[in-house]
Structures are given as structure tokens and as C-alpha cells.
Amino acid sequence: MHFFVRKYRGKAALLSIGTFDGYKIYNCDPFGKCFHKIQGATSIVEMLFSTSLVALVEKDDGNNRKLKLINTKKSTTICELTFPTPLLAVKLNRKRLLAVLEEQIYVYDISNMLLLHTIETTSNVFAVCALSPNSENCYLAYPDSRDHEPRTEGESSSPNVSNSAVSGQVILWDVINCKQITKIEAHKDSLACLAFNSDGTMLATASDNGRIIRVFAIPSGQRLYQFRRGSLPAQIYSIAFHPDSSLLTVTSSTQTVHIFRLKEVYSNLERQGLLPSSPPPKESLLRRSSRSLIGTVGGYLPQSVSGMLDPERDFAYAHIPGDKVTSIAAFGPDNTIVNVATYDGNLYSFRVNLRTGGECAMVNHFCVGLTAA
């Protein structure tokens, strides 16, 4: 299952789901199914923003080695690629398509599907990586290999199955020029989740421990924020930035959706009258605002100081009903809504009070059909 939300020619919110008999694409607001293809079981469905271009990985005899690039509007297959080992993830933006295998990442020019580079990685069985959605700040983040360093006290009590070959260090890679930019010391435990903001100027990280969420400036790697999800370990399922980078939402195995406020960004937007509750400004203004704050925050919080500060708790939160199940979240089209999709086929919408925070009210609940394959 893949959950995708982005402003594109207005506002859009799309949810794509791979199922045992094909795949579906839903519009979240207003809710409705906008595409359904009956075929074999589909394990990966990735959309290029709100376009008709979709990357699919079918469960072909269980090997998951074939990638198809589909135009859903024309019902045509643009290309097919077969890989030596199973595909674990596919990432794409307007410039690049990445095919993620356990020990390689293939980098393609999406305009002609020419293979540009193959990155050799450590064994990354959970495909922990992120591709910036921004075509100018076009970066890939993925884990460095673990050097078997001893863990510090309090960092080894995670109840989750660890991606043990993966370290807590992030490699930042320029996928336009095909070169490594820097390494970021993010966590002691193995990395579990990575996410860029819409501009590619911030990177959020979480480890297998799941207690701490950190945000770094990109490409410098300067630590900007540190948030505490909870006092007990948990498995982090997803991280997503608000479109203007003022908020961050996190889902985990606790069934609580945490929403953190990036205070310096939020305060700057408030001064400029660019808060999400205001009439939506031009995207370029939001981008300039969030970019300018990167330098400002970095100036106030050098890494040696920010590492000593107590992590902040969530600003707002929501509870997912029912049994514990894997979930993913993203901010909805009116920017005060957090949409949460669960792997048992439910879509929940929660409203965030941007002034007071606290518990978010559920405003919608829809069933999105079959459980994802």
C-alpha cells in the first residue's frame, strides 16, 4: 500500500493500494475510487504525483522481480524491467525512478528509463530509504552499513525485528549528479524510517527503537529538531511532513498518530500570515519560507547544542480505532486534515486544531476494499 498526498494544480489526495487481484487508486477528498485494474496480485503501486504514470510490481510466481511502468489513462505499458533479485520498493519523482533491491538501488532517468547508476548498499531487507519529491533538491537517503559498534545503554531494547546490517547513519546521495553528498549520524539503532519534506530541504529519521524522531537540514546534515514519540519502544510505520514543513506526522505500532510542530518554521509562517488555516498562498512563497528557516534554525541550534536539548513531545495526536495494524499517514488536501490508511483496508481522516493541538477529532472513515497484497 502506498499513500500519496500532494498539491498539484490545486489540491489532490490520492491513495493507491496493491491487492490480491490487482490494484486500486482512490481520491480521498471527496472520497471515491478513481481507478481499478483487475490483474495478478500486486505488491507495489507507486504513483508519479497525481499523474497517470504508475509503477507496478506484480507478485509473479512470488518472485517480485518485474517492474512495469503503466499509463493508466491510455491503459498502455510504457516499459518492463526485470531485476536479478526481488524488488522491495520503487521511488519516483519527475526526474528519477529508483528500484530498491535488498543490496542495490538502481537509478533511472524517468524521461527515457535509461539506467544511470547502480548503488551497492548493505543488506536492507526493509527497503529503508527516501527520495526527495523535489526535482531541484533531488536527493536519496538510505542507511549506511553497520560497523558493529557497541550500542549505548537504552538504545537496545527495541521489540522489533532489526534490520541488523543497517546502521543509524544516513547516506545522502545526489541522484541528478550520481554522487554521495554527506553522511548523517542520525541514531545509534538501525534506521527504520526516512522521509523528506516537499522541498527536499529537511529529512526526518527514526530508528528501530522508535522513541526519538529527528529532523535534519539538507544537504548540510545539521540537526534541527528532536521529538519524543513515547517512553516505550515502538515500530515506526510512516513519517510525513506537512506541505509547508510546519508539522510532522508519525504512525507506529502503538495505534497513536503523533503530530509534531516544527516551531521555528511554524512561527515564521505565522508572522507572514502563511499558516495552513489561512487562504492557501502560492507554493513558491511556502517553499521560500521553509528554505529560509533552514538556515535560521541551524544558526540557533548548532548540533552540539541541539543534541543536549530534551526532545519535545507531540503537539497533537489521534487514536486509530480497532486492532493494531500497520498504518501510513499524510496531510490531506485542506492542510488541517491528517489522512491515515491502514493495511486492513480503512481510511480515517482526523482534523488538527492548529492553534491548540491536543486530540484530533475523527471527521471521516471509509472502507477502501480488499486488504493490500
Curated annotation (Swiss-Prot):
A motif (L/FRRG motif) lies at residues 227-231. It is a peripheral membrane protein. Coiled coil: none annotated. WD repeats lie at residues 144-183, 186-226, 231-270. Residues 142-163 are annotated as: Disordered. Keywords: Autophagy, Endosome, Membrane, Protein transport, Repeat, Transport, Vacuole, WD repeat. GO terms for cellular component: cytoplasm; cytosol; endosome; endosome membrane; fungal-type vacuole membrane; Golgi apparatus; phagophore assembly site; phagophore assembly site membrane. It is found in: Preautophagosomal structure membrane; Vacuole membrane; Endosome membrane. The keyword Transport applies. Residues 144-154 have a biased composition (Basic and acidic residues). The keyword Repeat applies. GO terms for biological process: autophagy of mitochondrion; glycophagy; macroautophagy; nucleophagy; pexophagy; protein localization to phagophore assembly site; protein transport. GO terms for molecular function: phosphatidylinositol-3,5-bisphosphate binding; phosphatidylinositol-3-phosphate binding; protein-macromolecule adaptor activity. Its main location: membrane. SUPFAM superfamilies: WD40 repeat-like (SSF50978). Disruption phenotype: Impairs atg8-processing. Pfam families: PROPPIN. InterPro entries: PROPPIN, WD40/YVTN_repeat-like_dom_sf, WD40_repeat_dom_sf, WD40_rpt. Component of the PI(3,5)P2 regulatory complex. Interacts with atg5. Belongs to the WD repeat PROPPIN family. The PI(3,5)P2 regulatory complex regulates both the synthesis and turnover of phosphatidylinositol 3,5-bisphosphate (PtdIns(3,5)P2). Necessary for proper vacuole morphology. Plays an important role in osmotically-induced vacuole fragmentation. Required for cytoplasm to vacuole transport (Cvt) vesicle formation, pexophagy and starvation-induced autophagy. Involved in correct atg9 trafficking to the preautophagosomal structure. Might also be involved in premeiotic DNA replication. Required for the recruitment of the atg5-atg12/atg16 complex to the preautophagosomal structure. The N-terminus might form a beta-propeller domain involved in specific binding to phosphatidylinositol 3,5-bisphosphate (PIP2), leading to the association of the protein to the membrane. This is Autophagy-related protein 18. It comes from Schizosaccharomyces pombe (strain 972 / ATCC 24843).
